[in-house]
Amino acid sequence: MSIRSLVLAVLCTIAFPAAAHAAVPNSRDGEVKLMCRAINTFRAQNGVAPMKMSSPLVSAATWMSSDMATKNYFNHSDSLGRAWNTRLGAFGYWGSAMGENIAAGAVDAATTINQWKNSAPHRAAMLNPSYLAMGVGRGYSASSAYGSYWVADFGSSLDRVSDC
């Protein structure tokens, strides 16, 4: 781990202590893995290369989905007032091309990806050939307006990646 990554990890833990601990279980969510695979299947069906899962993007997406669920809002700007691209940088991800899809209400990956496929901007983000990496997160709160909240963050840099 580089000094820069270590410093960023410490700063994120200090700045977001509850979120850092709450985010980890969702990153292993079976529906999240299904979403990653579904996005790559959709890309393959449209002649676009698959993306890898990026650890910083997974962290950012998981934090954001949990933040929306626990604080009961639905927006690309988070509860701290940061735009999505600023948030990705705060989680250690920088790329020349980046994007974000969000959804709320659907509990499963299949319903959510179908919503995104039927929305031109969300469809374009999933099929953008400049995006090589993604991170998917799903948050849930029974007391929130929508229950389930999904975030898929995309980027052009391959930073700490693995297969879905």
Residue ranges and their predicted role:
Residues 59-107, 126-128:
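Short, surface-exposed glycine/acidic/tryptophan-bearing loops
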Residues 23-71:
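A short alpha-helix/helix-coil micro-patch that ends at or immediately precedes a cysteine
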Residues 104-164:
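Disulfide-stabilized extracellular recognition modules
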